[in-house]
Amino acid sequence: MSFSLNFTLPANTTSSPVVTSGKGADCGPSLGLAAGIPSLVATALLVALLLILIHRRRRSSESTEEIERPCEISEIYDNPRVAENPRRSPTHEKNIMGAEEAHIYVKTVSGSQEPMRDTYRPAVEMERRRGLWWLIPRLSLE
């Protein structure tokens, strides 16, 4: 299979570079091969990038499935790693109604006891300001 390019110019125009050597201007196959190399490289890079993204997504989805799986009570007592991490245990889930279940007191440096602030639950004042509750005056029945 041979490949050749045939360039013809209209009669009233002149071509700028005049070929003076004895060899002809038949460089068609090498020109076609050189023009195809960048597109082949770009295609290979896109395929490699796609494979990397698919591999990362599979690996991250497998790790999140393991983390989000509910923890059985028997697993808490049998596995020391789970027992050391109380965030995974079902006893430390958020209370849906927002009421506090227990008060934890922390002894400060000065010796007085203060209730420990729960870092996972926003303060009551912040919950009131989320809506329009801050517009309603606080009425105390005491």
Curated annotation (Swiss-Prot):
Which stretches face the Extracellular side? 1-33
What GO CC annotations are associated with the protein? cytoplasm; plasma membrane
Q: Which residues lie on this side of the membrane: Cytoplasmic?
A: 55-142
Disulfide linkages recorded for this protein, renumbered to the chain, are: none
Transmembrane stretches, start-end:
34-54
Keyword check for Transmembrane: yes
The record, for InterPro entries, names: Opalin
Q: Where is this region: Required for plasma membrane localization?
A: 78-94
The entry's note on the tissues where this protein occurs is: Specifically expressed in brain.
- What's in the keyword line of the UniProt record? Cell membrane, Cytoplasm, Glycoprotein, Membrane, Transmembrane, Transmembrane helix
Q: Which residues are glycosylated?
A: N6, N12, T14
User: Which GO BP terms apply?
Assistant: regulation of oligodendrocyte differentiation
Task: Outline what the protein does.
Answer: Central nervous system-specific myelin protein that increase myelin genes expression during oligodendrocyte differentiation. Promotes oligodendrocyte terminal differentiation.
Q: State what protein this is by name.
A: Opalin
